[in-house]
Each structure stands twice: as C-alpha cells, then as structure tokens.
Amino acid sequence: MKMTSRKLADLLKQRLQHENRSFFFDREKDTLRVEDQTTKKGITLELPPIIAKWETKKEEAIDEIVYYVSEAMEAMEGSGQEMSGKEAGIYPVIRSTSFPDQTSDGIPLVYDDHTAETRIYYALDLGKTYRLIDSRMLEKENWTKERIRETASFNLRSLPSVVKQDTVADNYFYFFRANDGYDASRILNDSILHEYKQAAEGELAISVPHQDVLILADIRNESGYDILGQMSMSFFASGTVPITALSFLYNEGRLEPVFIMAKSRPKKD
C-alpha cells in the first residue's frame, strides 16, 4: 500500500480519536493539527517526514507518533503543571533554531541561544512527557529566567548517562542514549565534553541529530568525518524531534558548527 498524506491523516485521526479533540488536515501544507476543543491548544504534525519513516518502519512509525501526540495532548489537557515544588523536574532541552519561539497561544517560550544551529529551551518533566516552560509560567510563579537556567543545569548534571561505543575505520563513536528525553541535552554538560576531549586522540566532534541521542566522535582520520556525517543524517531523518544534521567541533570549551564535506575535512560555517 502506498501511503499518502490523506491516508496518513485519516489513520492518525482514527488512532488519536477523543471526544474533546478536533482534527484539521491541511492538504496544501501537508499537515494535520490535533487540537483540544476547550483550550484550543494542540499539535501540528508535518506529514511527509512521518510518511518517510513509515516507508521503513511501517506500523512502528505510526505507534511512535501516536504515543508522542497522546502524551503531549494529555499534558496540555491536564492541570497541576506548577513549577514550585517540582524543581527537580526542570531540565534543558535542545531544539533547532527553526523551532517555534512561542506557544500556539502566542505566549513566548523561555529559551537561550546556544549555537548557530541550536537553542536551549526549558521543560517541566511530567513523567511520560514534558511541557516547555513559557513566560506566563514564570510570571505566575514569580520565577526569573536565571533561576530556571540554574535549576535546569543542576538537574541535567545529576542525570546518569547510558553510553554505547562503536569503532568504525579506526574512529571512535560514543552514543548517549538513556532514552529519558534529555540525551541531546547532555551536550550542555561541560564535564562530559571536557572528559571526552581530554581522552580523545584525534579531534572531538559532536552531533545532536535528534532529542534522543548525543553522538561524540573521536575523529582520528579523514574518513571519520564522512562516517559521522552519514550517521548524523540517518539519525536526523529517523528522529521524532529532529534537531540538526550538522556537527560541531569542540575546542577550548566552545562548539563550532561545521559542514562535513564528503572525502574531506570539515569546513567551518
């Protein structure tokens, strides 16, 4: 069966059906919006990337999206999302610079600039999902942005890491995949980056293709850049929340975006 945007939209409507939800399919933009009828809050899904995943993962791709949307909608529809008393559940999350800087209601989200490709947003963990923190939440509870930043940074450092190592063509790759929703966020943990930089025999390159993986690479020869580029593109295409397919070099505590050119060393952006 060939999957089309219309077929996918109908399938998702069926799987996500709820008495208090509305669905809006935009044929021109190839999107499906799932919206709470009471609050008018919701999620807009871009269908082409989901179709691309369906081509290789079939029902598993649909299951992932249904789970992601269901948890996010329940978080929006629920209550009790105050930050006070839940400080231990505040974490930073990495997003691309093209990610919206405000909610669907037009309320500014709290974020900091990170690199030319990425931003740091802040989230309140709700168990199976999380809510991005916006300016209204800060005002309501009289929190400052600095307090959010410091709290999130402290909590991130307390998270355990799950790392898998792979060696390809004498280059070493380390995959951080704890599947806790904050794997990419570990790029903000300077102690981790410093540790791997000190141990690296070559250049330390870093990739955050989507929110559920951080790749550190000890690049020891020219082919290492090509391999990292291929890995990053593959993860970027398969992630539920893609960030960037570009990589970074880590030098003197700074991240420098680079374009990895085939058969050559990277060129700085």
From Swiss-Prot:
InterPro entries: DUF1444. It holds the Pfam family DUF1444. It comes from the Bacteria. Belongs to the UPF0354 family. NCBIfam families: PRK13668.1. This is UPF0354 protein RBAM_026940. It comes from Bacillus velezensis (strain DSM 23117 / BGSC 10A6 / LMG 26770 / FZB42) (Bacillus amyloliquefaciens subsp. plantarum). The lineage of its organism: Bacteria, Bacillati, Bacillota, Bacilli, Bacillales.
